[in-house]
Amino acid sequence: MLLSWLTVLGAGMVVLHFLQKLLFPYFWDDFWFVLKVVLIIIRLKKYEKRGELVTVLDKFLSHAKRQPRKPFIIYEGDIYTYQDVDKRSSRVAHVFLNHSSLKKGDTVALLMSNEPDFVHVWFGLAKLGCVVAFLNTNIRSNSLLNCIRACGPRALVVGADLLGTVEEILPSLSENISVWGMKDSVPQGVISLKEKLSTSPDEPVPRSHHVVSLLKSTCLYIFTSGTTGLPKAAVISQLQVLRGSAVLWAFGCTAHDIVYITLPLYHSSAAILGISGCVELGATCVLKKKFSASQFWSDCKKYDVTVFQYIGELCRYLCKQSKREGEKDHKVRLAIGNGIRSDVWREFLDRFGNIKVCELYAATESSISFMNYTGRIGAIGRTNLFYKLLSTFDLIKYDFQKDEPMRNEQGWCIHVKKGEPGLLISRVNAKNPFFGYAGPYKHTKDKLLCDVFKKGDVYLNTGDLIVQDQDNFLYFWDRTGDTFRWKGENVATTEVADVIGMLDFIQEANVYGVAISGYEGRAGMASIILKPNTSLDLEKVYEQVVTFLPAYACPRFLRIQEKMEATGTFKLLKHQLVEDGFNPLKISEPLYFMDNLKKSYVLLTRELYDQIMLGEIKL
């Protein structure tokens, strides 16, 4: 009898297992992911209830006591243990305690390249309870001044290699801002932080200076990339840092991992997911001053790297390198980041071995995020019923002509169906606050949508168009500002760029729309960089786009460039290209026009340009 029951039970379990695999193939993946999210929420709730947070800095100090000799940062072959970083950052804190009027809550701007002192200064100021504003090291002159003014700092700390950048704006800085340089010899008007560090004590700083009780407390300002306008100082709260620092853990990283960080530390990916993520785990990071495709794998082998951070272009640059022997001879098991194209993803895995690519979606200023924890190629993440309850987001229809969300006759926004691109919006409430930007409230207000589904509700407009498929995987479609309309259809620039990028002589493709008198919408144009030692095959470009793209999405114009403007995280800038248009009198670089009769692209001459502008050639 017992044997019969056990047989029936066993058979039932097998049937249930196969039914689960058939009907709910991602059940256990979803379950474990949601469980991790719930654990993070429970931890944050405990902090709130207790009225005192355990911040990333607190966790770092705990590691410095428990594992003082463990390497925290490896930089250019030098090892900085948790204890080393603790003592050096305490020296920084004592310099400002003894030689400045900085107090808890004051803002200090930090302009420094990737180096250990970036972390020393950041953590040292955090020990004083200061808010640190990370400045983009690529900006200059008035743009730099605007960023400094936007975050309203009491002090500015500058790396040795960037003092020249600041020297030219010193006369324009407010007298209330003290400028500190990480160099013995500094320009007039700058205080040598390096000199004072040599005599500063490394004693612990009293915790009273940096104790935090509110999750909503501001701890950082991180500037947006500026791809859609001037960079804005996003307010980063303790809540956002604690959430972001858990990403490595959520993807399966442990204290035994060695994380390779090549992205700029002024960016949230490297600072919050990378450095803070290592602190969360008690792990080691290998810090690179600047990403180098040629040195990447040799560094990974040299330092036994097991995890690295990427943005999509980084992986593409690695795939563009000449093939070498032993490319799979490394210990890397995880690649964590965002923006990798499907074709690059496949090529990367095929070429560099069994590395799990962990794609995610997040924005500097947003509280919403998605994680691709199943490894589905091309997806930025996945959602399910339980995650939707924890993270309130929606995908709504977007009007590309009016450049705003569509609304029905009652004035409410409209949900998209699965498989359709929709504007990603996130509910703003006490559970998912939006902290906005420093400076004029208009910057914050412009990101909010009101009365979306009912009177009084408020949503954050991410500006990203996302597609949710039938299996609940999410895919990035385009930015609202990048998508343009032509022939009554919406053209996704990322899709067009991906198709052109498949050609073996194309290194880079940046797609945008240009206005033409007499036509509604914008005609597609692609700026292209060729691979070294290759030539442009215009017939192949034509064949590629007409084969893989609908007629309305095929670029009407090509522009050949040697170099493209990009942000510090390799996002291609389009604004100037759009402004330039396709006028051969204004552009010295080669321009080409799509000729359907010749089934090729042809040189865009002054005569052709005039014919297009006069309407003699129809597009």
UniProtKB/Swiss-Prot annotation:
One GO BP annotation of this record: long-chain fatty acid metabolic process
Residue ranges crossing the lipid bilayer per the database entry:
22-42, 119-139
Query: What tissues harbor this protein?
Result: Strongly expressed in heart and localizes to cardiac myocytes. Expressed at moderate levels in placenta, testis, and adrenal glands. Expressed at very low levels in kidney, bladder and uterus.
**Where is this protein found?**
Cell membrane, Sarcolemma; Cell membrane
A Gene Ontology molecular-function term?
long-chain fatty acid-CoA ligase activity
Q: What top-tier enzyme class does this entry carry?
A: ligase
Which Enzyme Commission numbers does its entry carry?
6.2.1.15, 6.2.1.3, 6.2.1.-
GO cellular component assignments: endoplasmic reticulum membrane; plasma membrane; sarcolemma
Q: How does it sit in the membrane?
A: Multi-pass membrane protein
Q: Which catalysed reactions does the entry list for this protein?
A: a fatty acid(in) = a fatty acid(out); hexadecanoate(out) = hexadecanoate(in); (9Z)-octadecenoate(out) = (9Z)-octadecenoate(in); (9Z,12Z)-octadecadienoate(out) = (9Z,12Z)-octadecadienoate(in)
| Pfam families given in the database record | AMP-binding, AMP-binding_C
**Per its UniProt record, what PANTHER family does this chain match?**
LONG-CHAIN FATTY ACID TRANSPORT PROTEIN (PTHR43107), LONG-CHAIN FATTY ACID TRANSPORT PROTEIN 6 (PTHR43107:SF10)
What is this protein's name?
A: Long-chain fatty acid transport protein 6
This protein's species is Homo sapiens (Human)
Which gene is transcribed and translated to give this protein? Answer: SLC27A6
